[in-house]
Amino acid sequence: MTNFKFSLLACSIAFALNASTAYAAQPTNQPTNQPTNQPTNQPTNQPTNQNSNVSEQLEQINVSGSSENINIKEKKVGETQISAKKLAKQQASDSRDLVRYETGITVVETGRTGASGYAVRGVDENRVGIMVDGLRQAETLSSQGFKELFEGYGNFNNTRNSIEIENVKTATITKGADSLKSGSGALGGSVIFETKDARDYLIDKDYYLSYKRGYQTMNNQNLKTLTLAGRSKKFDILVVDTKRDGHEIENYDYKIYPNKQADLRAVGPTREKADPYQITRQSTLIKLGFQPNENHRLSVALDDSTLETKGIDLSYALRPYSTAGNEKYGERIINDQSKRKNIQFSYENFSQTPFWDHIKLSYSSQKITNKARSDEYCHQSTCPGVRNPQGLHLVEKDGTYRIVDKDNNDFHYKKDDSDLWAWGKELHNSKGKKISDDVDTKGGSLDSVLINCEKLDCSKRFRIYQEYDENSSEKYTYDDREIKVETLPNGKKYGKIPLKKGEKLFSQEEARFLFPKSHGYSTDFVNDRDLNTHTQQIKLDLDKEFHLWHTQHQLKYGGLYEKTLKSMVNHQYNTAANVQWWADYFFCARQEGGNLGGEKKPRPDISVAGCANGTLLHSDIGKDTYLIPVTTKNNVLYFGDNVQLTSWLGLDLNYRYDHVKYLPSYDKNIPVPKGLITGLFKKFKSTDYVYGKKYSKPDGYTDCTYDTPCYKQNFKDNLALLLRKTDYKHHSYNLGLNLDPTDWLRVQLKYANGFRAPTSDEIYMTFKHPQFSIQPNTDLKAETSKTKEVAFTFYKNSSYITLNAFQNDYRNFIDLVEVGERPIEEDSVVRYPFHQNQNRDRARVRGIEIASRLEIGDLFEKLQGFHLGYKFTYQKGRIKDNGLHPKYKEFLKLNKDQHPEYEAIARKPQPMNALQPTTSVYNIGYDAPSQKWGVDMYITNVAAKKAKDSFNSQWTSMVERKEKQYTDITDIKASKANGKEVKDSRGLWRNNRYTVIDTIAYWKPIKNLTFTAGVYNLTNKKYLTWDSARSIRHIGTINRVKTETGKGLNRFYAPGRNYRMSVQFEF
């Protein structure tokens, strides 16, 4: 394999170095005055990007022909375009597959909630822009404080939403600062998606129909996609409906447990198999266009998708799980959803004027909801809340309901001869076995139990058990009684069986229903949390081509106004789950307040078992939030000009102005807990009595306990200080120089900048706790980046090699910093350790990239259709501070004597975990001249992540140290990771070098039918990706392994050998 790699690389370099002599007599590529994306005033039966035929062919990536043609003159530095056809050929199904064969970009892994955006040039998630049809996608709550407090416990679906791959027309990946296109957030790069349009299919016909079925073994995913496109006179329509149904991605050694019982018993961080989830995605894309003439077009689009994940968090670290015999206590059931709905209206005009050749006005409304719901309850039949060891069940026979034993027979009472101390009679089953210990023979009185007539037929009789009649005579017998039907205030029917009254005052019978000695349900502790992003945007785009003196210009300009509301809703409540028949068919009759002697009223919200103490089946503490809702308003103006000065010299001049405003608000219906805000800026006075019981207030103090006017006023004052408006202004630019000194060499230089305004949670998040508190910071600066890049491209015809060197400089990185202990009241000895988001000084990433493709048919005529490809990325980077980072101050002060080496560790530049290890991707392929079949082999080689290039953000809490715990200084031993003591800041888990081979083939037996199949990880290599390794958490309850031994790491390994196949019919 090593020899092969060097021979392929040598072949590519040899081609580049000899291009000028081998093809000196060949004609050059098309001149650069050919427009690339120029809209036209053609009717709808023409393609939208109407250029010359040659330029159109060069721009597209032809994946079914013999070559993948790329117009070198139109290729931007650090930019890659991936077409729908290429994605289909590679059988891409998600964001991971989108970048599978790209280098220098990977997805961010989060475990249960899947991928969360991309990592490019040393930054990830919110620092890499994602856009779909011109709209920025939802950002994560990126505050490190939020991640420390909430993300690691699986209570939020804090990920960036993805897009359905079947809807994608083109995906443009830009590496390096790209705020020009994406605005705030594109520090390291951007991924911009454009969805399909009816005109893509209706170039030479009036209808198109496609049905695609696919399957992949790594997650048992079934794919169904129906695509319809049609045109009738002035109207055209496109419908793409896609459904994916599968389960979790199967890690290597997925079948490690011998059976289902062993699988379900393997719980906690040491679990070696991926947690079981059922994952479905439903996506619908509809576009309707109306073009009354060649100069005007109106369109409306709907892009609606839902990604849903259901399953069990078996690896959950703090799941309330224990075993006692065969009984189980507690399971964590999850139901996550990511919903995105975008409605867009647009008007286009193709009339040529002195100011534009094409103008487009669009309005978009996009709503994104990322939901994370967890239900923690015991759902087995052996759970304490539903125990029914005698198998009691309800039957109906001859018009009478009866509660019988597991043998369908009645019970009977008799004296317990086995117990000399027994008093009275005990309940026995039909086989004479005593069952009083498992059946409630003291509760279930007829006057406390009501029958749910919505679920049982109350016109029938019910067999009850009478112990004493109304005259206090012993009976211990059955009696079939009529059910008296009454109506609840909501109109629903219920039934009751009154106790018989005796002749004496207050005398009545003792009669009851016999139920199992358990509640009949498990208490379900529900966490239902939503992260909502609602964006409205008005955008105006114009472009114009013109000649000025001897120069050619492609001018693009416009602006937009965007308003985004970001909010969180936290809903916690308890309800009944795993409900059994005696809690489902019956409910409580209870006097108000639980008092005795009064009238008992129906309480359908209380079970029979909870009747005595009034325990509610469903208790709701209401909705609240940990983040105040924030509206972001963004005003944008942009200008870009592609200038061709001469046949060999061109300029790219681009500028954008952003003005971002944050407008925080407060919703009384979904409040922030008052305790998080009181005393935040304006402290309570030293004479204010805030914490403790009202009756314990000392003399001379003011009562400021919860809900007092004093407390409310402090909350109001601090809230006003928190709701400060903030704004950010930024000038983005992208300058490029394109040189074509010969017909085989192109030199490009790029200088660009980008920015990221702080997210609302980074500015406004507040939290107070004796062990971890967060102070808001409305003075944060925007993060910035600058990219310097140079590229040399040697090319001829469809073959090329690009050598690229880059440098990215980042400033003002936002990080969570420990700002020291602060009193929560004036002159108080009670001090909380506070943290705050602050700006760090700088970071730098440098690297080189190679991208090449060789059409072997250009060298040897007999080898037409064969091609070779090679991509390579190497990058290094560090975060640097001027001086010591503030978060280490207290730690070093405590440990300077015993561990002076820690200061050197704290002061050295910090490695950037978002940098991928050195990666190479080789491609060998063949496309038959008939375009009826082809095959590609991709070889991906990833180097090991070096220890010195990784960083453990928790190292100060893992090394041997002195630690302040409240007022005491304690010696803490070093934690172990994979059997070794942690001694420095190097990452705990890293990937080894690995090589993965994928083989993909397609076959078109007839024009309308395409088969595609692939074998992935052909050699069944066991490997761990760096992005999966760095997703493993040391604290929290999800994405954990047993740090001391490394047990559970197998759960994070990539799939072994797996297969994909698809079939597509097109008409």
Swiss-Prot record:
Biased composition (Low complexity): 26-51
Disulfide bonds: none
Membrane topology: Multi-pass membrane protein
GO molecular function: siderophore uptake transmembrane transporter activity
UniProt keyword annotation of Transmembrane present: yes
Residues in TBDR beta-barrel domain copies: 204-1067
Span(s) of short sequence motif TonB box: 59-66
Cellular compartment(s): Cell outer membrane
Domain named TBDR plug: residues: 71-196
InterPro entries tied to this protein: Plug_dom, Plug_dom_sf, PT, TonB-dep_rcpt-like, TonB-dep_rcpt_b-brl, TonB_Hb/transfer/lactofer_rcpt, TonB_rcpt_b-brl_sf, TonB_rcpt_CS
Stretches for region Disordered: 26-53
Sequence repeat residues: 26-29, 30-33, 34-37, 38-41, 42-45, 46-49
Keywords annotated in UniProt: Cell outer membrane, Membrane, Receptor, Repeat, Signal, TonB box, Transmembrane, Transmembrane beta strand, Transport
Chain intervals for the UniProt region annotation (6 X 4 AA tandem repeats of Q-P-T-N): 26-49
Residue span of motif TonB C-terminal box: 1050-1067
Pfam families: Plug (PF07715), PT (PF04886), TonB_dep_Rec_b-barrel (PF00593)
Any one GO CC term of the record: cell outer membrane
Record's keyword annotation contains Signal: yes
Signal sequence range: 1-24
Misc. remarks from the entry: This protein is subject to phase-variable expression associated with alteration in the length of the CCAA repeat region. This mechanism is called slipped-strand mispairing. Addition or loss of CCAA repeat units would change the reading frame and result in introduction of stop codons downstream of the repeat region. This may be a mechanism of regulation and a way to avoid the immunological response of the host.
Family the entry assigns: Belongs to the TonB-dependent receptor family. Hemoglobin/haptoglobin binding protein subfamily.
NCBIfam families: TonB-hemlactrns
Summary of the function given for this chain in its UniProt record: Acts as a receptor for hemoglobin or the hemoglobin/haptoglobin complex of the human host and is required for heme uptake.
PANTHER family xref list: HEMOGLOBIN AND HEMOGLOBIN-HAPTOGLOBIN-BINDING PROTEIN 1-RELATED, TONB-DEPENDENT OUTER MEMBRANE RECEPTOR
Protein name listed in UniProt: Hemoglobin and hemoglobin-haptoglobin-binding protein B
